[in-house]
């Protein structure tokens, strides 16, 4: 059995770790809310662009929403484990944090490796959407119109891309390409936006996905602190229990 003085030295350490871990867990919970919000924001703000990407790319917002939800639940569990000062619950908390960190690390590596695939996918699908524009009532036709109207652009590389489409042969340029509301005759190149949409869309996606990547990286690194604190508090509680015995 440990001396009373030894136990008195251990208790302040446990109290200190509990206080710091509670503060950390609250901040960690907030990061979950932020990731959830970023995922929803990405789904809403990039929806038109994701319509022209492959299925892997469109899953990014859902991954963030799922990760944010898991972090919120895990943060709640971590707060409960810390308040209870349960050694095994804290070890479980540290294990879950480690698992999420590894998943985020793998996801970041996969995203970095396949980043060029997004660019190629966007260009190929955009060209395909132009060729099938208004022919099948495809949802991508609506995405093309929204992008061209919002960014004041026309075609993939430039407005000439439309001249190779069936739609142009029948009706000319779509109204979403027009500089003004009245664009007739719709084969007049002077009345449509000349710049292509591909570079503009890629700039927006890279910029906004950069924000998402930065936030995700910050959250992942922040988890290392939680792993360390949860492990240290668990050890301190376990040692204190042995000292009492």
UniProtKB/Swiss-Prot annotation:
Gene3D superfamilies: Tetraspanin (1.10.1450.10). GO terms for biological process: negative regulation of canonical NF-kappaB signal transduction; negative regulation of cytoplasmic pattern recognition receptor signaling pathway. It is a multi-pass membrane protein. Residues 41-59, 115-208 are extracellular. Glycans are attached at residue 134. InterPro entries: Tetraspanin/Peripherin, Tetraspanin_animals, Tetraspanin_CS, Tetraspanin_EC2_sf, TSN6/7_LEL. The chain crosses the membrane at residues 20-40, 60-80, 94-114, 209-229. GO terms for cellular component: plasma membrane. It comes from the Eukaryota. Keywords: Glycoprotein, Membrane, Transmembrane, Transmembrane helix. The keyword Transmembrane applies. It is found in: Membrane. CDD domains: TM4SF2_6_like_LEL. Residues 1-19, 81-93, 230-245 are cytoplasmic. PANTHER family: TETRASPANIN, TETRASPANIN-6. Belongs to the tetraspanin (TM4SF) family. This is Tetraspanin-6.
